[in-house]
């Protein structure tokens, strides 16, 4: 366990290189299980979630080689039914559910612990299991374990998701690429990270059309090849540092970004008064306004405003000149950071899924506790703008999704340091 000390009141100025997207890296790493050939992945962020997923794959018999900085080579030519993914890691990682489909396709049977992750609402796995069953899998739930088997090759299906789900869309895509026949998936999540997975699978030999849309068509192939693939930059990390500039009235240049992935965040930041300029194909400069204007924000599936930036924008709205309304439509329990922001002087009232944020002139440093990944960084952002020193505890959450955050902030003259508890 460790904490981060933040001394606020300093405008951030500098340049930050955005890392590879965690939410693309994890499913692409898992996709290596679909082939016996080597998959080389570039632009892989150094995060605890990535390390945990690689550890799970090693336990399944995958050969993992660190080729260089941000590059790994995965070869799943020696997996068998005699594997034992570590329960403690599987249970704490929601993304571990994705290993079910490829292992079932390769081995015909699999048994893993039920997955975990951030304690945010009812992140259920029923949509994943419904998709697996539709493809022909037999599923049994017993004592916090999931057992699955398939007596023959999975078959192509026409399937419409009851609700938009990033995770379940990924599970279904991985089933379909090796299933017998054609698959049509409707009401798919359209996140860029899903498209990135599809482009990687296509490079491995998968037959996928409709990438990036709500309707994806896949014709199954008998086997996939190896490939060399680079992960897209992390739009949530980019959005977080954009808020860092806005909340400190600073000026930051971000490199390695994809503008269209940031459209909803850029629109809201401009409405708040920030000035954002595109520099070239993959760089932008954001300059925060002296007076932050209030916003109305509703989280929704991509391409609308992402739930993973809700907490960061709430910190920004805490010092806006007026009243902001933030509505969380994705998860029913993603306001745990609110109580910590209130300790810092924020004026926030929760009404079911809606947060009414009345801006104050200044936040004040306090000892606060991170409850999940995005909450942890929202408290760091609040500390950057606050008067005095903020201590953010339980920063292991941050390590799940932000590569070298302290160092990147320090490069922009932030007074921030990590300390052991």
From Swiss-Prot:
Binding site for phosphoenolpyruvate: 22-23
Any one GO biological process: cell wall organization
EC number(s) stated in the UniProt entry for this protein: 2.5.1.7
Pathway, per record: Cell wall biogenesis; peptidoglycan biosynthesis
Coiled coil: none
GO molecular function, one term: UDP-N-acetylglucosamine 1-carboxyvinyltransferase activity
Catalytic site: 118 (proton donor)
Gene Ontology CC terms, in alphabetical order: cytoplasm
Reactions this protein catalyses: phosphoenolpyruvate + UDP-N-acetyl-alpha-D-glucosamine = UDP-N-acetyl-3-O-(1-carboxyvinyl)-alpha-D-glucosamine + phosphate
Disulfide bonds: none
Gene3D superfamilies per the UniProt record, alphabetical: Enolpyruvate transferase domain (3.65.10.10)
Keyword Transcription: no
General function of this protein: Cell wall formation. Adds enolpyruvyl to UDP-N-acetylglucosamine.
Record-given protein name: UDP-N-acetylglucosamine 1-carboxyvinyltransferase
Source species taxonomy: Bacteria, Pseudomonadati, Pseudomonadota, Alphaproteobacteria, Rickettsiales
